[in-house]
Amino acid sequence: MAILEEPFAGVLELRNYVDGEWVDSEGERRDVVNPATMKTIARVPISTQDEFDAAVEAAQAVYPEWRRTPPLARVRCLFRLKELMEEHFEELSRVQTMEHGKTIDESRGETRRGIEMVEVATGIPTLMMGYNLEDIASGIDEYLIRQPLGVFGIIGPFNFPFMVPLWFAPFAVATGNCVVVKPSSEDPISQIKIVELAEEAGIPEGVWNVVNGGRNVVSAMLDHPGIKGVCFVGSTPVGRDVVYQRCGATGKRVICQCGAKNYAVVMPDADIERTVASCMTSFFGNTGQRCLANANLLVVGEGLDAASLDAFYKDVVDAFVEASSRITIGYGLDEAVQMGPLRDRAKVERVLSYIQKGVDEGATLRLDGRQFELVSDLPRDCFVGPTVFENVTPEMTIAREEVFGPVACMMKAGSLDGAIDMIHGNPFGNAASIFTGSGRWAREFQYRVECGNIGVNIGIAAPMAFFPFSGMKDSFFGTLHGQGQEAIRFFTESKVVIQRWF
């Protein structure tokens, strides 16, 4: 397969996009580094609070006019944005690979999912409709309408720099709101590319703004009285203890989609070959840096004696290790590569510390990600190979805490009840999957497991754009989720009108 050309050369000097203008920042500038090559590809400003405030002011100024814009007119802008994204599909995908490190196939998938968010949001004339009832009393009618609220803030994560802000922004804009997006300062280029296309699509000045920055911009967003709601995707400590708490204190609407420790449950009737193939993507896709990544593979011996469970467990683990060992590692623009680097050195050190902790706590290291081969001559700084532990118990650190890297824990349970208890012993509730041919086991699993996204013979339980991206327990803080009808409700207020004519 070919090694693809990079979509741009040199070092990009990024700016903020506020009120339809590209604006320089007075803040310091930080390097954006390609984690595969360790070359600086851009410099991003760490904007000031005043610069964020200016973006909110611009959005507030245009909001009344944008709100009054007919839904079909708003939709035409979004439909044009979708068309432009399709035209620039490959460029947008390669940018993600350069700035994040994921493989080009993963980037193309992310681009497609992001475009689908815009596509679904173009259905807003129907999605935003209210409802009515005549003659609730003699000569009196009642109906509900949905109205936008104002300006929303969106805080993007590093792991999906293109897609995640699009879980929210198209729905907010389609319903008549304005947005200020703060991309991750680690990989902000994708959001700059999106807003360039939004400008070309005819979205009015001030409706869709991008302000780069760090904690100071987040803090300004959480405290600003002009921000009606905040959408956050990131770690549980930040989401729960900072964003959720401070939005509550200031009366903002909030979506906090947070961390995870997802289980994949393998029942005795599962097709091992197909299950393992699905797990390669769900455990090691995006180098394990996603909230829907599976982390613990739980082999279940429902109806088996101890010896049979041990034999089944061995068959599954051996197949998993063998498949993991064949994953090719390198620069994601090489189409033969199946796994790229972690985002930066700090994340590598974090993952390595968990690998060592697993060894220290007595788990068996079947595949050591500290020892790996690259398919080409690259700096090894940000790479870690697939790592597989077996004989992992629920109390071990690697089984309990979110590693956010390519580390798989092999575990076993004697029954489906025991497996569900093990899942519930973890504080997270983002996703869980079961592999089985039994409808009875699958229904029991999906009915009882306290996770927001359930996969049945699906490794990555990723909802489509017209369904909400759910989450429970320490994986989600808020009331409504992003995507689909719940996003429409989040970005609008319900107004009830009761009328009588004399």
Residue ranges and their predicted role:
Residues G229, P237-T393, D417, V456, ...:
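ALDH superfamily catalytic-core signature
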